[in-house]
Curated annotation (Swiss-Prot):
Stored InterPro entries: AAA+_ATPase (IPR003593), ABC_transporter-like_ATP-bd (IPR003439), ABC_transporter-like_CS (IPR017871), ABC_transpr_PhnC (IPR012693), MetN_ABC_transporter-like (IPR050086), P-loop_NTPase (IPR027417)
Catalytic EC class: translocase
Pfam families, sorted: ABC_tran
Record field: catalytic activity: phosphonate(out) + ATP + H2O = phosphonate(in) + ADP + phosphate + H(+)
One Gene Ontology term, aspect cellular component: plasma membrane
Protein name in the entry: Phosphonates import ATP-binding protein PhnC
Cellular location(s): Cell membrane
EC number: 7.3.2.2
Name of encoding gene: phnC
Binding-site list for ATP: 35-42
GO molecular function: ABC-type phosphonate transporter activity; ATP binding; ATP hydrolysis activity
Keywords: ATP-binding, Cell membrane, Membrane, Nucleotide-binding, Phosphonate transport, Translocase, Transport
């Protein structure tokens, strides 16, 4: 569970981008965050793993499976590193290494599990290779394992990025505009991948997305932000014209 209690974020220039955010996100939800550019969507997501510090309030994270509890605002050092290992982070950039194979790119998620000379030389244990291959298999990408990343389409590269995130074995995935650069067919495929991972693996997914139609189609819950405030928080079927007006204005 993720809990936001009276969270505010003010930039050094005085602009307030998050205003009194009170929110609970439960394990197994697929949450789409929508709103205009500058509404605070990216800032909200990046407070979860403390890429962005908050100005006031608190963020609490409980991982039921491991019985671990984090008060994000007070988490730092090795404990913050441990928290971030449990949270997969994706963006619209694929962040693949162009001249490396798909498998090598996915294996990068396992670097933190390596020690000593293996970490220095980039050697991976058989267990890590199996985790990476299993992640590719879940996305039907095994046939691409030994193909260089720069030979793939944009949609395929984003799916490789998702496979890499899966290989991290996260409890939570936060994705910032993961389909904004994709055509409608590929965007649907990537969203379908998120949905399958959410349902089959029980991984909580929070996606910042501009495509309202995709949010309604794939999310179990939609949160609408307007000028840093939550103005809508409900199931997709309740996202009617009145709700859209609250989120996007006239």
């Amino acid at each position: 569970m993720i809990v936001f209690n009276n969270v505010n974020k003010v930039w050094p220039n005085g602009k307030q981008v998050l205003k009194n955010i009170n929110l609970e996100i439960n394990k197994g939800e697929l949450v789409a965050v929508i709103g205009l550019s500058g509404a605070g969507k990216t800032t909200l997501l990046k407070t979860i793993n403390k890429i962005n510090d908050i100005s006031s309030g608190e963020i609490l994270i409980d991982f039921d499976k491991t019985k671990e509890h984090y008060e994000v605002t007070k988490t730092r050092g090795k404990k913050l590193q441990k928290l971030r290992q449990k949270i997969g982070l994706m963006s619209q950039e694929y962040n693949n290494i162009a001249n490396k194979t798909v498998l090598q790119n996915v294996l990068n998620a396992r670097v933190s599990s390596q020690k000593g000379i293996n970490k220095i030389l980039g050697f991976f244990k058989r267990e890590d290779k199996m985790i990476a291959l299993n992640s590719l298999d879940k996305l039907n990408l095994l046939d691409y394992a030994y193909i260089r990343a720069d030979n793939l389409s944009g949609g395929q590269q984003q799916r490789v990025a998702l496979a890499r995130t899966l290989a991290q074995q996260p409890f939570l995935i936060i994705a910032d505009e993961p389909v904004s650069a994709l055509d409608p067919i590929l965007a649907n495929q990537v969203m379908k991948d998120f949905k399958n991972i959410n349902k089959k693996d029980g991984i909580t997914v929070i996606i910042n997305i501009h495509h309202v139609d995709l949010a309604k189609k794939y999310a179990t819950r939609v949160i609408g932000l307007n000028n840093g405030e939550i103005v809508f928080d409900d199931v997709p079927s309740k996202l009617d014209a009145q709700a859209m007006k609250k989120i996007y204005g006239e």
